[in-house]
Amino acid sequence: KEGVRTVILGKPNAGKSSLLNVLLGEDRAIVTDIAGTTRDVLEEHLNLKGISLNIMDTAGIRDTEDVVEKIGVDRAKEYADKADLILYVIDASRPLDENDAEILHLIKGKRAIILLNKSDLDMQVTKEQEELPEEFPVIEISAKNVQGIEELEDTLKEMFFQGELTFND
C-alpha cells in the first residue's frame, strides 16, 4: 500500500502500541504492562487528516537475552532505517538511559517527531532536555488520555505539506 512509511520506535513500555491504537481509533495492538509484549512489526494503513500513512508498531528497543525479542529489536532497527518518518515515543515519566541514546543515534539525520508520552504522570524528561536534538519537533502526549494527539496530527500535516515527508510506493 502507498503511504508515508511511518515507524513507531521506542523502548519497551514507552507506549508505542497505545499510540498506534489511539491513532487508529481501535485496539489493534496488544497492550500490557509487560515489557516486550510487541515482538514483531504490526503494520496498519491509516488516513490522518488527508495524509496516507503506512504505520508500523515495533518491538521496544533494548539489549535483551530473549532470542525472539532480539529478532524483534533487530527488525525494528531495520524498519527504522527504511522509514520516511519515525515517531520516537519516550516514556517521559522515566529518565533517559543508554537505550534512548541508541535510539537517538538511530534517528540522526532522519525525519522524526519525538513524543514525550505519559505526560499525565510526573515528568522526568522535558522538551528542554539537552539530549534531545533540536532538529526534531518534540510533543508532549498522553496516549492513555489521548492528549497531544491533535498537535501530533497537525505537525505531521505541516511536515507533509511543506514537502518534508514523501510517499514511498
PLM feature spans:
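Inter-motif core of Ras-like GTPase G domains
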Residues: 69-93, 142
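Conserved active-site aspartate in kinases
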Residues: 57
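Short alpha-helix of the ABC ATPase nucleotide-binding domain corresponding to the H-loop/switch region
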Residues: 35, 61, 69-73
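C-terminal-of-GTPase-core extension/linker across diverse P-loop GTPases
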Residues: 1-52, 64-66, 96-169
